Amino acid sequence: MYATMESVRLQSEAQQLAEMILQSETAENYRNCYKRLQEDEEAGRIIRSFIKIKEQYEDVQRFGKYHPDYREISRKMREIKRELDLNDKVADFKRAENELQSILDEVSVEIGTAVSEHVKVPTGNPYFDGLSSCGGGCGSGGSCGCKVS
């Protein structure tokens, strides 16, 4: 019974933490950028084009430079990727997304290291993965040098 009550309390506190993050300026900025991105017709056109060319690019990559359309599709992919990256709404959204992800990474590492310095907390962020005992994505087999308990 005690473990169940403790689990309920921990989940409740985790929900409170999630609510605090949701109410943060960073999360609000993320939602605003996402909304602006969704409402922008030009960004939508670029994203749809990117998805279409990406599918073609993945098909071409199976055969590599031996595919007859390899050069053309690769060129189109670079062009649309550049157009996507240079779009203000897309850039703002990516920046907001990275800022929110940084907060989530910080919280994950903080909680993990508070429990134990040996807890593996892969974040996908090289800075935070260096602070954790896990190099990220190791499958906890210890081959990355992390401390497997």
Swiss-Prot record:
Q: Which Gene3D superfamilies match?
A: YheA/YmcA-like
Keyword Cytoplasm belongs to the record: yes
| Top-level taxonomic group | Bacteria
Localization terms from the record:
Cytoplasm
Arranged from A to Z, the UniProt key words for this protein are: Competence, Cytoplasm, Sporulation
What GO terms fall under cellular component here? Answer: cytoplasm
Example GO biological process term? establishment of competence for transformation
InterPro entries, per the entry? Bact_com_dev_regulator, Com_YlbF, YheA/YmcA-like_dom_sf
Q: What does this protein do?
A: Regulates sporulation prior to stage II. Positively controls the competence regulator ComK at a post-transcriptional level. May modulate the translation, stability or activity of ComS. May work together with YmcA to regulate community development.
* Protein name, as recorded: Regulatory protein YlbF
Q: Which organism is it from?
A: Bacillus subtilis (strain 168)
